Amino acid sequence: MTSPGTDAVSAACFERARARIPGGVNSPVRAFRAVGGTPRFIQSGAGPYLVDVDGNRYVDLVCSWGPLILGHAHPAVVAAVKQAAERGTSFGAPTEAEIEMAEEIARRVPAVEMIRLVNSGTEATMSALRLARAYTNRPLVVKFAGCYHGHVDALLSAAGSGVATLGLPGTPGVTPGQAAETIVLPYNDIDAVRTAFERYGGEIACVIVEAAAANMGVVPPEPGFNRALADIAHENGALLVLDEVLTGFRVSSAGWWGRDPVAADLFTFGKVIGGGLPIGAFGGRRDIMQLLAPAGTVYQAGTLSGNPVAVAAGLATLRESTPDIYARLDHVAAVLARALRDEFGRIGLPHQVQQAGNLFSVFFTTEPVRNYAQATGQEAWRYPPFFHALLDRGVHPPPSVYEAWFVSAAHDDAAVNQILDALPAAVRAAADARPPG
């Protein structure tokens, strides 16, 4: 392994990939379009580190976009995956491990009385919307600009994550009818929610919101915002769906619910509960969940739902995630966020470093960011040189200013110090940047 140097093999892989894979990647943000340069093709990961196909090693601040709270290739997770795979990779039949996962989630989040396992966070939110519409017999959904809930057609309007990264208002292929059934409101604006319910209340099936927004950069909910959403929805016969795909079991042992226990009607999960393998889940009130087939008439199914290898990886991750693990996650995030603030402050560059638990991100702006308009109004052109200065020094942050930074409990002092050593040059690169054109 070497310090970051050549990217020749990654460049060759990228060229080869573009011949057969649209854009050369299987998820848009991976293509480095927002930061420029060659995306790094990864060969392996261990603890807090990634190694690319050129042999360069990086401290990882992406962590597979959130699932890897224990770090890469944690021995307990690897052993669980190996043991499960040796028993069979898929059965198309129920397993006891699925029950254990459902029980573990319900134990951690008591508001989740029943749960259904699926294959991705997108599938979880898609299914939760179908269930909410069936339960209420209403068509409309309220979402918030900048919140990302996967690539569900009805939820891609003014979405965060890759949609924000690519500067898209939405996406072709979403029909006007689907878009018309989605009411998009400013995040953290409870008055806008009240106004929407005054106008459309009898037609709104649910409000869906990230438990803490982290796909337009990290924008935590204002105190009481999620609770007010629940109150307004319930006053009008609608449901609240809390999307914990990203925050679930990362920001605490009970996810965001552990920090702000708002009893939503439905929750969605993913990422951590798969330990790095594909999985998702949605759950909530028993009377709502029992509408799902075969108990009820709302159809939802999946060939690989509850996959035994993914469930094994997720259970191992959850069982290894002791209070000390969460304390380490919080400590590392706090150290890095403080260092970013100090370095930006020392150089006098306008900035906001915002946190939601151990999630954090940088905004190049003078005022705290509360919503999507403010997030997209920042000097985002400062991020590419900032990113590449870190990458050149062996630190791999997210390749978009609109994504959260993720740490793991495997980020030891050596890894943290490598990040701290890289920050001065990165902040200087951001300060020296000039707007395009």
Curated annotation (Swiss-Prot):
It is found in: Cytoplasm. SUPFAM superfamilies: PLP-dependent transferases. Keywords: Cytoplasm, Isomerase, Porphyrin biosynthesis, Pyridoxal phosphate. PANTHER family: GLUTAMATE-1-SEMIALDEHYDE 2,1-AMINOMUTASE, GLUTAMATE-1-SEMIALDEHYDE 2,1-AMINOMUTASE 1, CHLOROPLASTIC-RELATED. This is Glutamate-1-semialdehyde 2,1-aminomutase. GO terms for biological process: protoporphyrinogen IX biosynthetic process. The gene is hemL. It is an enzyme of class 5 (isomerase). It holds the Pfam family Aminotran_3. Belongs to the class-III pyridoxal-phosphate-dependent aminotransferase family. HemL subfamily. The modification N6-(pyridoxal phosphate)lysine is found at K271. Pathway: Porphyrin-containing compound metabolism; protoporphyrin-IX biosynthesis; 5-aminolevulinate from L-glutamyl-tRNA(Glu): step 2/2.
